[in-house]
């Protein structure tokens, strides 16, 4: 694994893959991120984030079956790894602690 820290966009992408389930591919991930964030998202940004997540060990990819509608080209399918799931859950816990502290007026 190259690194364990995630940027905001990588986090959104990781969560989208998790929400869409195993064996999702880039197009639904892009649509999910756009809908969830309300921001336009390019396919290039999605592909780059998925590549970084795979380099870090947070997602795994495999090639799906070739389909006629894709001109015989297979889709690259993604799934969240156990390490990716653990990281996503930890990020969620950190955000909850911070928001709880804010709500309670604590500074640290």
Model-derived regions: residue spans:
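Exposed loop/turn and edge beta-strand positions of beta-sandwich/beta-sheet ligand-binding modules
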Residues: 74
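Amphipathic alpha-helical dimerization/coiled-coil segments
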Residues: 83-108
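N-terminal helix-turn-helix DNA-binding core of bacterial DNA-binding proteins
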Residues: 3-45
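Beta-hairpin "wing" of winged helix-turn-helix
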Residues: 56-71
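Alpha-helical residues within the helix-turn-helix
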Residues: 31, 54-55
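Basic amphipathic alpha-helical segments that dock to polyanions
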Residues: 46-53
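Short beta-strand/turn micro-motifs at beta-sheet edges
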Residues: 1-4, 65-67
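Conserved beta-strand segments that form the floor/walls of ligand-binding pockets within enzyme
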Residues: 79
């Amino acid at each position: 694994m190259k690194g364990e820290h995630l940027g905001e966009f990588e986090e959104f992408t990781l969560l989208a893959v998790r929400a869409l389930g195993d064996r999702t591919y880039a197009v639904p991930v892009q649509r999910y991120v756009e809908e969830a964030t309300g921001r336009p998202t390019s396919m290039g940004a999605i592909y780059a984030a998925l590549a970084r997540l795979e380099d870090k060990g947070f997602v795994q990819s495999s090639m799906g079956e070739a389909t006629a509608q894709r001109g015989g080209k297979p889709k690259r399918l993604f799934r969240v790894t156990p390490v990716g799931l653990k990281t996503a859950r930890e990020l969620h816990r950190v955000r909850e602690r911070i928001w709880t502290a804010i709500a309670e007026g604590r500074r640290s």
